[in-house]
Design a protein with these regions (language model features):
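P-loop NTPase catalytic core of nucleic-acid-dependent motor ATPases
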Residues: 104-150
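Intein modules and their embedded homing endonuclease domains
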Residues: 2-123
């Protein structure tokens, strides 16, 4: 998770999110990319669900969103469900919704391997001095240890 950009938010109901959206003077919700972003970030179904996977360079849905899914990567069927969800807010512009999804995903990018490795705790066992010996049968001496540090 991109800790620099991502903030924890409490997911809100449709009515709560509608109150947050920018409206015209007549009270009608404006159909803007920014309103789409607000919905994607705060709607209780979509909040924290859409992220850019830096390893695959694809947009992923990373939490249950209330419809059947077969994998993590955002697909056409997911888009149809998201469009249907956005209609609850009076927004149906597929281009604006797609733009908002790209922005939200980019702001919540992650790298699954880096995140996994950064989450590991070192067990305190020194391995560098022994790696060349273990994998290549090299002598365990100061030279091979220093060579591994390079």
């Amino acid at each position: 998770m991109s800790k620099e950009v991502h903030e924890e938010r409490a997911p809100r109901t449709v009515e709560d999110v509608k109150e947050m959206l920018v409206k015209h003077s007549n009270g009608e919700i404006q159909r803007t990319i920014q309103n789409c972003i607000t919905i994607l970030q705060d709607d209780h179904v979509l909040a924290d669900a859409i992220r850019l996977n830096l390893l695959s360079e694809r947009t992923d849905i990373v939490k249950p969103v209330g419809w059947p899914r077969s994998g993590k990567t955002l697909n056409d069927t997911d888009m149809k469900y998201i469009l249907r969800r956005m209609e609850k807010y009076g927004i149906s512009s597929e281009k604006k919704i797609e733009s908002a999804i790209r922005i939200v995903a980019n702001e919540n990018r992650y790298h699954p391997i880096r995140d996994y490795l950064n989450g590991l705790q070192w067990d305190g066992t020194e391995r560098i001095p022994h790696v060349l010996h273990h994998f290549l049968g090299a002598a365990e001496d100061e030279y091979t240890c220093e060579a591994m540090k390079i």
